[in-house]
Amino acid sequence: MVSTTFRRIVSPCWRPFGIGEDSSPGSDDTNGRLDGLLWYKDSGNHITGEFSMAVVQANNLLEDHSQLESGPISLHESGPEATFVGVYDGHGGPEAARFVNDRLFYNIKRYTSEQRGMSPDVITRGFVATEEEFLGLVQEQWKTKPQIASVGACCLVGIVCNGLLYVANAGDSRVVLGKVANPFKELKAVQLSTEHNASIESVREELRLLHPDDPNIVVLKHKVWRVKGIIQVSRSIGDAYLKRAEFNQEPLLPKFRVPERFEKPIMRAEPTITVHKIHPEDQFLIFASDGLWEHLSNQEAVDIVNSCPRNGVARKLVKAALQEAAKKREMRYSDLEKIERGIRRHFHDDITVIVVFLHATNFATRTPISVKGGGLLSAHNPVL
């Protein structure tokens, strides 16, 4: 008998998603499709398999940006090929996430060319270069648009290259591996990313070690741990007001200013990087912003992907998270769907999901591809 819990988890696979459900393999969704506050690309091919993407908007302006790039990961024709996945969860506004979406992949390609190969050092250099570029933009716009100093983005990157998976994370987005765990072919969820959120004790300890003379480096405020009592994440690209003292002053709004002058950055942009050798039992990767993980556990997400057809599976994950969000507020999912952006943020965050299947099939392609998550949802955001 199917358990109630399992039925609830995989139910998105058994019922129609809603308006715009038509997602047959032959349908043309080259640039994705838009259905209200939902953008999705149900299926696509990368160099070693297939992928599925979905984004749902909650904020008045979409703060999540994302991309999937498959093909050369170097500026040289002789360089390696890879599949690159980026999930950029903005806060304070969309500007930093949008900037990272435009610049990080290029910077990593540039350093891959210089170093003649992929490595953790190449990725770190790409993050740091993108950070410096954005802080330069903040400097340029400081007098006319000071609020840009309070904008940042959590950045999660995955690169599949030459049989290795490189995972780089700065912030609290997450990537989870679905892996065959036993002879019965059951899939186990394995988290591959390290998160930087002050709710995690090890993150608080790291901050205290880095700032031993600051008793207020982490503060418990309204039952939530925050860096300097302001922000939950300890690493990001952007958030210039907590990295350079020159931005910790007027005309920045008082709620973003810290009372003490600081000499070294309070937040960092350098990611934590792990390298994972891909094995035959490794089936797929789920990359998602924290909006998904607020409502689904790692294992629940893996079970959904394992139980659903590949086509449209990212959209199924988004629906499962929204169903949980509605349940927590004791409302119907159909009523949640009717709530407009902005107001919707009181019920859930922007959610980005990219599912990447790892092993080559008949659907794999050597043709370079580039997909930006969000499509027309992102087009409403202001250009810097």
Swiss-Prot record:
<keyword id="KW-0597">Phosphoprotein</keyword>
<keyword id="KW-0378">Hydrolase</keyword>
<dbReference type="InterPro" id="IPR000222">
    <property type="entry name" value="PP2C_BS"/>
</dbReference>
<feature type="modified residue" description="Phosphoserine">
    <location>
        <position position="78"/>
    </location>
</feature>
<keyword id="KW-0479">Metal-binding</keyword>
<feature type="binding site">
    <location>
        <position position="89"/>
    </location>
    <ligand>
        <name>Mn(2+) 1</name>
    </ligand>
</feature>
<keyword id="KW-0904">Protein phosphatase</keyword>
<dbReference type="GO" id="GO:0004722">
    <property type="term" value="F:protein serine/threonine phosphatase activity"/>
</dbReference>
<keyword id="KW-0464">Manganese</keyword>
<dbReference type="InterPro" id="IPR001932">
    <property type="entry name" value="PPM-type_phosphatase-like_dom"/>
</dbReference>
<protein>
    <recommendedName>
        <fullName>Probable protein phosphatase 2C 48</fullName>
        <ecNumber>3.1.3.16</ecNumber>
    </recommendedName>
</protein>
<feature type="domain" description="PPM-type phosphatase">
    <location>
        <begin position="47"/>
        <end position="358"/>
    </location>
</feature>
<feature type="binding site">
    <location>
        <position position="89"/>
    </location>
    <ligand>
        <name>Mn(2+) 2</name>
    </ligand>
</feature>
<dbReference type="Pfam" id="PF00481">
    <property type="entry name" value="PP2C"/>
</dbReference>
<dbReference type="InterPro" id="IPR036457">
    <property type="entry name" value="PPM-type-like_dom_sf"/>
</dbReference>
<comment type="function">
    <text>May dephosphorylate and repress plasma membrane H(+)-ATPases (PM H(+)-ATPases, e.g. AHA1 and AHA2), thus influencing negatively plant growth and fitness.</text>
</comment>
<dbReference type="InterPro" id="IPR015655">
    <property type="entry name" value="PP2C"/>
</dbReference>
<feature type="binding site">
    <location>
        <position position="349"/>
    </location>
    <ligand>
        <name>Mn(2+) 2</name>
    </ligand>
</feature>
<dbReference type="GO" id="GO:0046872">
    <property type="term" value="F:metal ion binding"/>
</dbReference>
<comment type="similarity">
    <text>Belongs to the PP2C family.</text>
</comment>
<feature type="binding site">
    <location>
        <position position="90"/>
    </location>
    <ligand>
        <name>Mn(2+) 1</name>
    </ligand>
</feature>
<feature type="binding site">
    <location>
        <position position="290"/>
    </location>
    <ligand>
        <name>Mn(2+) 2</name>
    </ligand>
</feature>
<keyword id="KW-0460">Magnesium</keyword>
